[in-house]
Amino acid sequence: MCGPLCDALLAIWKIEGVEDGSREPSNPPDLQASDLLSNLDSANLFIVPLDNDRQWYRYHRLFADLLRQRLQQSPADVTDSHLRASHWHQANGYLAEAFQHAVAAKDFERAAELAEQVWPSMEDTFQTTAWLGWIKRLPTDVIRVRPVLCTQAGWSFSDAGEPETSERHLQNAERALAGAADRAEFKPLPGNIALARAYNAQARGQVADTVKYAELAQQLIPEDDVYRRAQAVSMTTSAAATKAR
């Protein structure tokens, strides 16, 4: 914990429901939890510093257990606290923690949105295995109606060497796309789905299907997605050369 996070959790927030069902916390008053934490730290009471700057702390184990027991007496407060923590962590760039708190609050739609947001950076840094651990905590019904999340899952399972599981998610992505409104974020998906299938075919040693899906990906991937188009061209060339032998 840190001062700003404690301010966010201790503030009397109003979680406002809007017509589309989203929930956002209103701005909290300017509490001074940082001063309180500093005083407790100086007195060596209840908390332990986690960094040299003494910005982050944890509770002493026994005190944490006591607070946890007290909080469990009010389940609604537990959910509300997790939701507030999720919003705070997201606003401050801690998306992994934001996801964990959203799941703890059982706000699975919010958790799914966070998983979609963080996937590109986790894929770029070879963390798709960790990302798959995230979405395995989400209900299947939440995943399969989200074409972006399904496509990301298809790619991640392909990276993990599970082409059959990948294909199931790619099929769910196509079904979700068929019933979805036309949105800019959906435009790259058909090409990405085709490219993922090319990788799955390559993993199975299916050269003809690799060429077919890689060529389809070249047709579908937007012109400005230079990286994905280059992947499709490379796969087409490599598979065609293998086929010609």
Language-model-detected regions and their locations in the chain:
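C-terminal boundary/linker of central alpha/beta nucleotide-binding cores
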Residues: 1-70, 80-83
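Generic structural signal for secondary-structure transition and capping sites
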Residues: 45-46, 94, 205
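Heptad-repeat amphipathic alpha-helical coiled-coil interaction surface used
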Residues: 86, 98-99, 111, 153, ...
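Extended alpha-helical scaffolding segments used for macromolecular assembly and cargo binding
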Residues: 73-160, 165-168
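Short, polar/flexible loop-turn hinges at active-site or ligand-entry regions and domain interfaces
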Residues: 17, 71-76, 180-181
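Alpha-solenoid helical repeat architecture
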Residues: 94-96, 107-109, 145-150, 181-192, ...
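Tandem amphipathic alpha-helical repeat scaffolds
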Residues: 113-121, 148-163, 189-206, 228-245
